[in-house]
UniProtKB/Swiss-Prot annotation:
EC number: 3.2.2.23, 4.2.99.18
SUPFAM superfamilies listed in its UniProt record: Glucocorticoid receptor-like (DNA-binding domain), N-terminal domain of MutM-like DNA repair proteins, S13-like H2TH domain
Statement: the UniProt record of this protein carries the keyword DNA-binding: yes
Family: Belongs to the FPG family.
Protein name, per record: Formamidopyrimidine-DNA glycosylase
Catalyzed chemical reaction(s): Hydrolysis of DNA containing ring-opened 7-methylguanine residues, releasing 2,6-diamino-4-hydroxy-5-(N-methyl)formamidopyrimidine; 2'-deoxyribonucleotide-(2'-deoxyribose 5'-phosphate)-2'-deoxyribonucleotide-DNA = a 3'-end 2'-deoxyribonucleotide-(2,3-dehydro-2,3-deoxyribose 5'-phosphate)-DNA + a 5'-end 5'-phospho-2'-deoxyribonucleoside-DNA + H(+)
Biological role stated in the UniProt entry: Involved in base excision repair of DNA damaged by oxidation or by mutagenic agents. Acts as a DNA glycosylase that recognizes and removes damaged bases. Has a preference for oxidized purines, such as 7,8-dihydro-8-oxoguanine (8-oxoG). Has AP (apurinic/apyrimidinic) lyase activity and introduces nicks in the DNA strand. Cleaves the DNA backbone by beta-delta elimination to generate a single-strand break at the site of the removed base with both 3'- and 5'-phosphates.
Length: 276
């Protein structure tokens, strides 16, 4: 599933193409995604200029004068920029939406159809008040994210610290890979109760989250199965993981075998020596 780094890589790849350009038309081939694409979506965007592209959590927010169209990649979604100087590749089975510009096509592909393409009109208020966005946690690269915030929001909580990171109500975008990697960098065992982690350890964890996500963005995200960036290239962060998907292999720091457990129906990886 694309997480914050993969979505940010996509945003950075797309924005230079679309910002300041007008959508000539929208071709919706499959309206039944995770939620239905609005019936008048294509008409609403015809000839609209894209003012910019932002990211909130794992959502991409494309601003036009009349509002925002929101794209979520779901589990298997990608957005590709395809040149339009010659006929672009014919849409394949899982190519659901095309935004056609004068020189290129922005194509949304999603084999499992858990992604979404939605509309938020400007007269409904700021897009961040949209029901899907309003309750999200803080952005990990914002000034609001800190060890103090993690410490405050987890007092009295018995859920594991890894599950607290994944929940998304404190901080967004720390998916399964990045939670395991961040906890390793911070030296915190993922099974530790969130409410029992001290402030100094949470300060280390906040720094580790930022560093892990920044490294992942720099490497183009992680490609475990389907993800490619807007240029069609795979990400490479998974090749440098300290613990994720390395069960039984030696820790890159101490040499102890990496362990794998299941938490909340998801695999967790950690070093029993480096993480306490």
């Amino acid at each position: 599933m694309p997480e914050l780094p993969e979505v940010e890589v996509t945003r950075r790849g797309i924005e230079p193409f679309v910002a300041g350009r007008r959508v000539e038309r929208v071709d919706v081939r499959t309206a039944m995604l995770r939620w239905p694409v609005p019936a008048d979506f294509a008409e609403m965007l015809r000839s609209r200029e894209v003012l910019g592209v932002e990211r909130r959590g794992k959502y991409l927010l494309f601003e036009v004068d009349a509002g925002w169209f929101i794209v979520h990649l779901g589990m298997t979604g990608t957005l590709r920029v395809l040149p339009n100087d010659a006929p672009p590749p014919a849409p394949a089975k899982h190519d659901h939406v095309d935004w056609v510009f004068d020189e290129f096509v922005l194509r949304f592909r999603d084999p499992r159809r858990f992604g979404a393409v939605l509309w938020h009109p400007r007269d409904a208020g700021d897009v961040r008040a949209h029901p899907l966005l309003a309750s999200l946690g803080v952005e990990p690269f914002s000034a609001a994210f800190s060890g103090a915030l993690l410490f405050k929001r987890t007092r009295g909580r018995t859920v594991s610290v890894k599950q607290a990171l994944l929940a998304g109500d404190i901080v967004v975008g720390v998916g399964n890979i990045y939670a395991s990697e961040s906890l390793f960098r911070a030296g915190i065992r993922p099974t530790t109760a969130a409410g029992r982690v001290s402030l100094p350890r949470y300060e280390r964890l906040a720094d580790a989250v930022r560093a892990t996500l920044a490294d992942a963005i720099e490497r183009g995200g992680s490609t475990l199965r389907d993800f490619v960036g807007s240029n069609g290239e795979s990400g490479y962060f998974q090749l440098d993981c300290f613990v994720y998907d390395r069960a039984g292999e030696p820790c890159r720091v101490c040499g102890a075998p990496i362990r794998q457990i299941v938490q909340g129906q998801r695999s967790t990886y950690y070093c029993p020596n480096c993480q306490r």
